[in-house]
A protein has these predicted regions:
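Short Fe-S-cluster ligation motifs
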Residues: 146-164, 401, 438-467
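Detector for the c-type heme attachment site
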Residues: 123-129, 259, 416-420, 430
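Radical SAM enzyme [4Fe-4S]-AdoMet core and its adjacent flexible, acidic
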Residues: 228, 232-244, 251, 255-358, ...
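C-terminal accessory region of radical SAM enzymes
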Residues: 311-345, 375-422
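Conserved alpha-helical substructure of the radical SAM core
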Residues: 64, 71-210, 214-215
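Radical SAM/AdoMet-radical enzyme domain recognition
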Residues: 142, 146-162, 171-295
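Acidic, low-complexity/disordered tracts enriched in E/D and polar residues
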Residues: 1-38
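Cysteine-cluster motifs in flexible loop/terminal segments that predominantly coordinate metals
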Residues: 402-450
């Protein structure tokens, strides 16, 4: 399967099945485009038939000379011989064994607080309450969750725990206790905990910063961008904005953080389709690592992203990608999460086919110890998997998630992006279509554009020119 596109002046050819990416000239681009409609995927290298070469030359004779086309075929044949063009999908058969795999729990999202000191308009957690009551996780429940993770992680050594909310800093003492407990269990069980924290920053102080810099492998700092954008969507419960209080704290934290991982994470909505300006605002504030995610909300919400918004959104990603390249070449570079793409290694096959592992390898834990496939399913009793005392008892739901992969989704099976997005978010699919094996269409279009931009950026930064 071949996917081709032009972005920011770069002609990109992606051989989907092998993962090979080629930045080519217009001639090679046009010849491959002509061939891709006539050559099927192949399990092994082959020679291009002379009759097809003649047909191609005749079709493109008004645009290119015979010599140019002949040389293009030499380059294309070399790529075919190296199995980097017109390759077959070798993973379709693998997925049958993949469905039977034994999974272990590798990561937990601990809902340390079902409470929040902000009242974000788009919050899927309903101001931290998750369709239920306000609650703070006790140390005892959190300890059982870590014990559950250790017991169900098999031979997996590296384990991940994200302190999530609501607002985790509203239960800070328990966060510290659980980190201490986790560290105390590492040597005895041959495990290594990677703790992360997501915070709105309201309660952030020097003591918390120092602890996070010592113990947290990653910290996510929630902020939506420009002051007017942030304060419209992320006010306090009394309606006042949060930007002026939070930004200085986040700047101080990022400076103290040094080269350790962190992300300033925002959400864009229908109200700020020029979200690229918010990304650049983060960069201008001095932040080096950032992400701005599209809101996912029902159509009836005034801030929801509609299908009609897509043309503007896709153009905005293109503009942001071009500015991203420009700033990197000027020595003012930053990291934008959705433009991060590893073309040489990347995730293992299982990850490429099934994504985040929700419901199998990754679970969410409520303040009272209930287990759900991920934080976005919390409160939906149809997806209650069990609790930290009994473990996973609803094996039917777990097995449904185990079967969730790109080949189980009609919309993903023949999509060029399938090995990069891994089928997308199961919660979004369920919320919009009632099935975890469907796909959220608006999200798909944005994801495909982000992948195209990320590949273009790789080509542009590898290009020594300043254009």
């Amino acid at each position: 399967m071949i996917h081709q596109y032009i972005n920011n002046g770069y002609y990109i050819v992606l051989d989907v099945n092998s993962g090979s990416v080629h930045s080519v000239d217009p001639l090679l681009y046009d010849v491959i485009s002509f061939l891709s409609e006539r050559i099927p995927d192949s399990e092994k290298p082959f020679q291009i038939a002379q009759s097809l070469k003649d047909e191609t030359a005749a079709a493109l004779k008004e645009k290119y000379s015979q010599k140019e086309i002949r040389e293009a075929f030499e380059d294309i044949q070399e790529l075919i011989d190296q199995e980097e063009l017109f390759t077959a999908d070798i993973y379709k058969n693998f997925v049958m064994d993949f469905k039977k795999r034994q999974t272990v729990v590798k990561a937990l999202c601990l809902h340390i607080a079902h409470d929040c000191n902000l009242a974000c308009q788009y919050c899927f957690a309903e101001e931290g309450e998750y369709h239920g009551r306000r609650a703070l996780m006790t140390f005892e429940v959190g300890k059982k969750a870590l014990d559950f993770l250790i017991a169900n992680s098999g031979n997996r050594r590296n384990l991940e725990v994200d302190f999530f909310g609501g607002e985790p800093l509203m239960n800070w003492q328990v966060v510290k206790q659980l980190v201490e407990y986790g560290r105390s269990q590492e040597e005895a069980h041959n495990k290594k905990f990677r703790f992360t924290l997501t915070t709105n920053g309201v309660l952030l102080n020097d003591e918390i910063m120092e602890f996070c810099n010592r113990e947290m492998a990653n910290v996510v700092l929630s902020l939506d961008g420009r002051k007017e954008v942030n304060d419209k969507m992320r006010p306090f419960r009394n309606g006042t904005g949060s930007y002026d209080l939070i930004v200085p704290k986040f700047q101080k934290f990022a400076e103290k953080r040094g080269d350790r991982d962190y992300f300033v994470r925002g959400t864009f909505t229908h109200n700020n389709l020029d979200f690229g300006k918010d990304v650049l605002h983060f960069a201008d504030l001095g932040f080096k690592k950032m992400s701005v995610e599209p809101v996912v909300a029902p159509d009836e919400e005034p801030y929801a992203i509609k299908e009609a918004d897509l043309p503007q959104i896709l153009e905005e990603y293109d503009r942001l990608a071009a500015e991203y390249v420009k700033r990197h070449k000027e020595g003012r570079g930053f990291t934008f999460f959705h433009f991060m793409l590893d073309l040489t290694q990347g995730p293992c096959v299982a990850k490429r086919l099934s994504g985040c592992g929700s419901g199998t390898e990754y679970l969410a834990v409520t303040p009272w110890g209930d287990l759900y496939p991920c934080h976005q399913f919390v409160g939906n009793e149809d997806f209650l998997l069990g609790n930290v005392d009994t473990g996973v008892t609803n094996t039917a739901v777990r097995d449904e998630f185990k079967l969730c992969n790109v080949y189980a989704k009609d919309k993903c099976r023949d999509c060029f992006a399938r090995f990069y997005c891994s089928g997308g978010c199961a919660a979004n699919s369920y919320n919009f279509h009632g099935s975890i094996t469907d796909a959220y269409d608006i999200g798909c279009e944005m994801q495909k554009k982000r992948i195209e931009c990320a590949i273009m950026i790789k080509a542009a930064l590898a290009d020594g020119s300043d254009e």
